[in-house]
């Protein structure tokens, strides 16, 4: 009874935060559909002006501030991804609490008069670990990701049903803020497989999103490869693009369809070892101004990027280009939530499209910035304190073989006698440090496409240790099946005047150091 009253109180508080018109719509439910060259909100033409925000990249205490920042820009909608791997970090164990409470985030959007577009994957890209797919899928070696692999599709359906439990009641038809739900994500950049995309659509519908408007996004160059007749088609492109050209083909095949840029890239992501990416504010503002003048809907990706906390940053391909923790994206609202000059230039332009209404005031930052004084670290513990498990094997095991998603592995083997100039070769994902008898020999860096290292001379029985750190899994393209650790066999090659000799050590000790907060605290206290 007490729980029921609490729920009723929260619901009433949410309704009271709305305008009278919004309150009536919330009580009765509404409609969002496609009309003749326009979207229709409750039967009236509506231009979607969406701000892309990702709830896991923003501390929950700041969610409402960021939403209000977007509203003060002149946005009427928030667009978000649902990240499968943050909600199901262990198979079958779902977490929609705390910073993962996507339903609470959507309710905050509604409280502040914003509609919501939900993009539940299963794949999301987003410069996020493995594009949002859980690492534990890789424990099934023959799995085919983003295809009609039976196990993959089974797990997708289970996840999407959990998303439905959280969000289906929040669609506009039920009085909630959700006006659109996306099916898959930019599949044209991955392949051509309409049966797979159709199956994902059916799963999304069965998860409770059977009445809300469904759409799929892609690039203008490939959207027809997987376009489903019953879905709305939207385009993704960035600043500086020729707007008319981006929608030319869509206009030819669907002349009466509404136009929407579902990702208008405000900036770009950063990778390790490169300069911070920036894009001119002028190009962004002019592109959005042109779209609004033509009645074209959009979602600004990103309006606020935030931070890929912990191990959640992904990596790009071809090659291996890990993303940094910051997801600032050169967005109008910077990583820590402050308005940039780009924000105010955009706000000035957006004020032309408010039907004469004054934009809300820009909210103050929820907390002031501080300067951390110089300090010295005086205590440390050996890395080996963090070891939580080990296994013997006749070849190196991957993280996934050891049931570990993220962290570091320590591989140890005994060497035969080797002469100076012998070469160690293997596939190391992602950064390997090599020691012989406890002495550091060198590193092998996947970022630099390194696969080998020269070894010093060593007597028979010497111990070789390889410490491998895993970085973010690739989140784009066919390389998303990205195992971590030492992948396959390791070889040691020597050459003399008579012959070349290549050998593979057959006895390995594999030890894991998981990337886990509790594990780190335990290691420090050991």
How would you name each of these model-derived features?
Residues 421-435, 526:
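Aromatic-lined ligand-binding clefts that engage carbohydrates, nucleic acids, or primary amines
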Residues 98-118, 141-178:
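An active-site-proximal structural segment forming one wall of the substrate-binding cleft
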Residues 114, 206-207, 211, 240-334, ...:
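Catalytic-core region of carbohydrate-active enzymes that cleave or remodel glycosidic bonds
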Residues 63-129, 201-212:
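Aromatic-lined substrate-binding rim segments of carbohydrate-active enzymes
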Residues 24-77, 107:
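N-terminal carbohydrate-binding accessory modules
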Residues 92-100, 110-111, 122-147, 197-201, ...:
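Aromatic- and acidic-residue-enriched segments that line the glycan-binding/catalytic groove
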Residues 133, 137-140, 164, 173, ...:
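An acidic-aromatic loop/edge-strand motif
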Residues 151-229:
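Active-site neighborhood of glycoside hydrolase catalytic domains
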């Amino acid at each position: 009874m007490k729980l029921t009253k609490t729920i009723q109180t929260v619901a009433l508080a949410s309704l009271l935060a709305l305008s009278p018109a919004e309150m009536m719509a919330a009580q009765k439910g509404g409609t969002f559909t496609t009309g003749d060259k326009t979207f229709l909100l409750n039967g009236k033409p509506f231009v979607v002006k969406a701000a892309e925000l990702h709830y896991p990249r923003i501390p929950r205490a700041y969610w409402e501030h960021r939403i209000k920042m977007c509203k003060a820009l002149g946005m009427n909608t928030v667009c978000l991804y649902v990240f499968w791997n943050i909600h199901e970090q262990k198979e079958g164990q779902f977490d929609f609490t705390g910073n993962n409470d996507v339903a609470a985030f959507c309710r905050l959007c509604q409280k502040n008069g914003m509609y919501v577009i939900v993009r539940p994957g299963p794949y999301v890209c987003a410069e996020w670990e493995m594009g949002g797919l859980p690492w534990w899928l890789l424990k099934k070696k023959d799995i085919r990701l983003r295809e009609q692999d039976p196990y993959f599709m089974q797990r997708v359906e289970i996840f999407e049903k959990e998303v439905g439990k959280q969000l289906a009641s929040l669609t506009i038809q039920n009085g909630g803020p959700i006006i659109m739900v996306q099916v898959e994500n930019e599949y044209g950049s991955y392949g051509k497989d309409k049966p797979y995309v159709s199956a994902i659509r059916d799963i999304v519908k069965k998860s409770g999103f059977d009445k809300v408007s469904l759409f799929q996004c892609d690039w203008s160059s490939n959207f027809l490869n997987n376009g489903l007749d019953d879905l709305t088609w939207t385009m993704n492109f960035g600043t500086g693009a020729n707007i008319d050209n981006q929608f030319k083909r869509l206009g030819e095949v669907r002349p009466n369809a509404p136009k929407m840029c579902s990702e208008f890239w405000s900036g770009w992501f950063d990778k390790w070892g490169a300069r911070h990416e920036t894009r001119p504010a002028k190009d962004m503002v002019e592109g959005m101004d042109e779209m609004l003048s033509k009645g074209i809907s959009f979602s600004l990706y990103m309006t606020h990027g935030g931070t890929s906390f912990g191990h959640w940053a992904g990596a790009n391909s071809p090659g291996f280009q890990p993303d940094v923790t910051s997801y600032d994206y050169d967005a109008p609202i910077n990583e820590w939530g402050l308005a940039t000059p780009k924000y105010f230039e955009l706000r000035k332009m957006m004020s032309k499209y408010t039907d004469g209404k004054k934009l809300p005031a820009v909210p103050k930052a929820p907390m002031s910035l501080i300067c951390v004084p110089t300090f010295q670290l005086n205590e440390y513990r050996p890395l080996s304190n963090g070891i939580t498990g080990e296994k013997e094997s006749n070849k190196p095991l991957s993280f996934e073989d050891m049931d570990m998603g993220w962290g570091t592995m320590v591989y140890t083997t005994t060497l035969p006698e080797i002469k100076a100039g012998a070469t160690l070769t293997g596939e190391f994902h992602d950064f390997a440090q090599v020691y012989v008898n406890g002495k550091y020999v060198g590193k092998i860096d996947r970022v630099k496409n390194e696969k080998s290292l020269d070894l010093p001379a060593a007597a028979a029985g010497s111990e070789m240790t390889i410490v491998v750190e895993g970085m973010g899994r690739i989140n784009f393209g066919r390389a998303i099946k990205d195992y971590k650790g030492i992948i396959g066999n390791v070889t040691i090659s020597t050459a003399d005047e008579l012959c070349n000799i290549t050998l593979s050590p057959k006895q390995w000790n594999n030890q894991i150091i998981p990337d886990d907060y509790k594990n780190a605290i335990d290691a420090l206290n050991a």
